[in-house]
Amino acid sequence: LESNNVITRKRVVSFLRTLFHESEIQQFERDNAHLEGFDFIDEVLGYFDFTYKISGRDLERIPSYGRLVIVANHPIGTLDGLALLNLIRRVRPDVKVVANEFLSRFKAYEPVLLPIDNMSGNSRRQNLKNIRSHLEQEGAVIIFPAGEVSRMGPTGVRDGKWSKGFLRFAKETRSSILPIHIDGRNSMFFYALSIVAKPLSTLWLIHEMFKQENNTIEFRIGDKVEWEAFVNTDISAKEVAQMFRRHIYRLGKGKTPVFKTRLSIAQPENIQHIRKELQQCELLGETGDNKKIYLFNYQPNTAIMREIGRLRELSFRAVGEGTQSRRDIDAYDRNYMHLVLWDEDELEIAGAYRFCDTNMMLSIQGIDGIYTSSLF
């Protein structure tokens, strides 16, 4: 009898190792032991040939700077989290993700993780402090508020109730929240198993990950929600968290968002394109700290003008103003000349000022051609 029990245990262990793809995972770790962080993530996504789709306009909604809490639904599990990291780092190399227990076991992920250890109160306090610290250093943090993968329900595949923790981080650090909807699914067997035996279905997720091979998911990114939109409210944090959950799913369906959003500022222009265009401009002089002064005559569809417009919007929003457009460019730019201060050390536009020949402008367009006439 004891011999039969030993044989049975061995068979069960062998089955579980096969089910959890133990040998494949261990072999992958050995083959890529020299990689970590985003390099390791690239290899994981490549191993599964797991890809994602996103529109150019959605990609531009990712803020290129500033404190940012990114929240998303979690339809698949590990792979949708890695794909989201891969996406966000294209704009925000400083992005990190709040880790689940499975990812925390892999040292290769450490550079991009902000793990939470529930085993120790002191450790947990330190981990929460690390998340706040990363945001206070103007970083970006991905959080899956559901804390687990989506399940099948009466309205389809949906996250469970969202934890309010992400709101606390955003409020304490005055961070904007970027909502992202992920369109993806696990197998019907997984959802059926979730109904019958939820703990077992969680273990089954490893097998589900391998069934995602050659799959493609789609990201929909909404405009960011400024912290003022959710901090000054009489609604409880628990209710606000569920409102963000609804916001995400409305985003996925292209419906009107729950929260008032703010159009993200355009992404920076390609540095080499700006430099090439500046070389065609008249060089007026240089400053003592290695900055060059160029005269730029307006031309449509130029990297210089787009970058000036982006920097204007960035500067004015910082003091509570701005056009609330992706770039601050108006009709006066077409008829004005532009002084551009180029920082050769930092490879960026350090400043810009537009001006015109007033007498000439008055003779051609009258008083309406003068910008200051629109202010008084």
What spans do the regions from the language model cover?
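Short acidic (Asp/Glu) patches
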Residues: 55, 65, 69-71, 77-84, ...
